């Protein structure tokens, strides 16, 4: 077994795929990374894709079963997985949906009788003024 490593190091060492340095490269890289990860092709990473999906699903259901509202501060990866779990997204669609997620963006999931529903995606009202749009970041 390998010592724990990050996903970018794992895919570089095990598959010869380096982390891209620009947006266009990352657009192609993310679906590839998710595919390799979901197929169990990354040894020594902190968590398998299946375990990550199960963990996010469990937390979503735990929060939805609670009383009142909840505020969760998290990463784009967790937001993407929450969308996958909530809307049964296949892997290419999930990867594509993750790409536009902005740092410091707001997302809202609402529990309904039929399950969780995504009711807000990628909102940045605190950065939407013209003089703040320079602060929009994705990576």
PLM segments and residue spans:
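Generic surface-pattern signal
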Residues: 35-43, 61, 65, 123
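Active-site-adjacent alpha-helix immediately C-terminal to a catalytic or transition-state-stabilizing loop
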Residues: 54-115
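Phosphate-handling substructures
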Residues: 1-55
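A short acidic, glycine-rich active-site loop
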Residues: 19, 92-96, 139
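Residue-level signal for functionally critical sites in structured catalytic/ligand-binding pockets
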Residues: 1, 9-16, 67, 80, ...
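Conserved histidine-centered catalytic loops in small-molecule metabolism enzymes
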Residues: 4-10, 26-38, 110-139
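A generic, residue-level signal for flexible/boundary positions that often mark functional hotspots
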Residues: 13, 93-95, 133
């Amino acid at each position: 077994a390998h010592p724990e490593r990050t996903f970018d190091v794992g895919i570089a060492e095990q598959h010869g795929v380096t982390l891209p340095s620009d947006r266009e490269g990352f657009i192609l890289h993310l679906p590839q990374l998710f595919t390799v990860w979901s197929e169990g092709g990354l040894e020594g990473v902190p968590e398998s894709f299946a375990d990550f999906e199960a963990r996010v699903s469990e937390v979503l259901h735990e929060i939805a079963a609670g009383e009142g509202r909840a505020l969760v501060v998290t990463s784009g990866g967790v937001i993407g997985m929450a969308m996958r779990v909530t809307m049964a997204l296949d892997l290419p669609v999930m990867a594509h949906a993750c790409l536009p997620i902005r740092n410091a963006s707001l997302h809202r999931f609402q529990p309904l009788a039929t399950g969780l529903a995504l009711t807000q995606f990628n909102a940045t009202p605190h950065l939407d003024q013209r003089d703040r749009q320079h602060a929009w970041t994705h990576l």
